[in-house]
Amino acid sequence: MTKVYANSIQQERVVDRIALLERCLDPSNSLPTAKRLVAVAVATILAVALLVVAGLLFSGVLCSPVSVLAASLFFGVGAFLLGGALVGGVLTTEAVTRERLHRSQTLMWNNLCCKTAEVEQKISTASANAKSNDKTRKLGE
């Protein structure tokens, strides 16, 4: 009797794990993270580029405006392009990491399904044994 109860508790835990894995495997759950990452990266690029341009423009106003203005635009555009390359690298790394995570979760899912099938087989075997024991008891009485 206690084995059947323990098996039902184990089966409930397996069902909870399956539900958790289904939520993890849902690709729509990872989209907000990528969107937030893009927004933060673009804001950082713009802030760095604008700070470089503003600093150089301020020094250009104090010194010689034409040459420093050209330099500030050059450095601002350079900072923006460098930031864009950095963000591209970060997003590529994030996409690869998410893909690897999804693949490992899929493997975990397959492993869990195999374990669940084994648990269900053990439970059905235990219930069949319990039924046969009940039949033998009835015959013995």
UniProtKB/Swiss-Prot annotation:
Keyword Membrane: yes
Keywords: Host membrane, Membrane, Secreted, Transmembrane, Transmembrane helix, Virulence
Coiled coil among keywords: no
Main subcellular location: secreted
Protein's membrane topology: Multi-pass membrane protein
Segments crossing the lipid bilayer: 38-58, 68-88
Lineage of the species this protein comes from: Bacteria, Pseudomonadati, Chlamydiota, Chlamydiia, Chlamydiales
Functional note: Inclusion membrane protein probably involved in early modification events of the chlamydial inclusion.
Subcellular localization(s) per the UniProt record: Secreted; Host vacuole, Host pathogen-containing vacuole, Host pathogen-containing vacuole membrane
UniProt name for this protein: Inclusion membrane protein D
Record InterPro entries: IncD
Entry GO terms, CC: extracellular region; host cell membrane; pathogen-containing vacuole membrane
Superkingdom of the source species: Bacteria
